[in-house]
Amino acid sequence: MSFPTVFIDGDQGTTGLQIHARLRDRTDVRLLTLPAAERKDAARRADALNACDIAILCLPDAAAREAVGFIRNPAVRVIDASSAHRTQPDWVYGFPEMADGHAHDIAHAKRVTNPGCYPTGAIGLLRPLLQAGLLPRDYPVSIHAVSGYSGGGRAAVDAFESGDAAARALPLQVYGLALEHKHVPEIRQHAGLAHRPFFVPAYGAYRQGIVLTIPIELRLLPAGVTGERLHACLAHHYADARHVDVMPLADAAAATHLDPQALNGTNDLRLGVLVNADGGQVLLSAVFDNLGKGASGAAVQNLDLMLGARHAA
């Protein structure tokens, strides 16, 4: 029996290693790997990219574009985990749960671009509310997110884990201070916002896991929109989603904190709607593993859809 061949280009980076770990013991796919000495050899990479059924690119943006250019075999399908193609119209955005029928689009796509970690939480919260008309497209969205340091890739992991005292001395590192984070165009486009969202990311002194929050002033929404209606919209949208759940309002009301590490090691995304006592303000929240639903888990979910696994979404 012949099994689909998968080549991970960049399998020694943070995301590539995680994807390899998720696939190495599976019996329904065959992993094509290159010897260590050949991983950066353009000719050998090109051979592998054209010999596989599905290529997963875990590379910097420029290298990912180069890898796509190496592919001459029209049968090869691609999942790109970089941000190189996330706003390109000829690539399918790899967030199966974001819209009805989108898992089908991914399943039949030739080119799939994996979402960024922060956009996964932001789009997961915003898009259903915008589509339902509960949140105006021109709402002034502000997003704050804290990720484990693995979100910074191999360099950040090495800095935190190799004894770099300067890196470990800061319990929180707020960055993107020029307000030009590369995820902003992706969030705006796929959430459906009319304007750029205000986005402030940070790294915490822990390895992985994200908590992302978006404050909402109900007085700026259409008349009659309440926290309960926002929650009902999200709960309905994700009712059949295998990897996304929406906290019941009672659980959200009883919460005293949000643990960014709560879903580590999973491909799950947990959304919440927290309403203050007088009902005038709402805090939308998302908790997930930046290396799971925010990266490698999402890539494997998209791979499963492309291989015909209906249960993947």
Curated annotation (Swiss-Prot):
Oxidoreductase listed as a keyword: yes
InterPro entries: AGPR_type-2, NAD(P)-bd_dom_sf, NAGSA_dehydrogenase, Semialdehyde_DH_NAD-bd
Catalytic residues identified in the record: 117
Primary localization: cytoplasm
Biological process according to GO: L-arginine biosynthetic process
GO cellular component: cytoplasm
UniProt key word DNA-binding: no
Compartments, record wording: Cytoplasm
EC number: 1.2.1.38
Keywords associated with the record: Amino-acid biosynthesis, Arginine biosynthesis, Cytoplasm, NADP, Oxidoreductase
Assigned protein family: Belongs to the NAGSA dehydrogenase family. Type 2 subfamily.
PANTHER family, alphabetized: N-ACETYL-GAMMA-GLUTAMYL-PHOSPHATE REDUCTASE, CHLOROPLASTIC-RELATED, N-ACETYL-GAMMA-GLUTAMYL-PHOSPHATE REDUCTASE, CHLOROPLASTIC-RELATED-RELATED
Functional note: Catalyzes the NADPH-dependent reduction of N-acetyl-5-glutamyl phosphate to yield N-acetyl-L-glutamate 5-semialdehyde.
The protein's name in its UniProt record: N-acetyl-gamma-glutamyl-phosphate reductase
Species, as recorded: Burkholderia orbicola (strain MC0-3)
Taxonomic classification: Bacteria, Pseudomonadati, Pseudomonadota, Betaproteobacteria, Burkholderiales
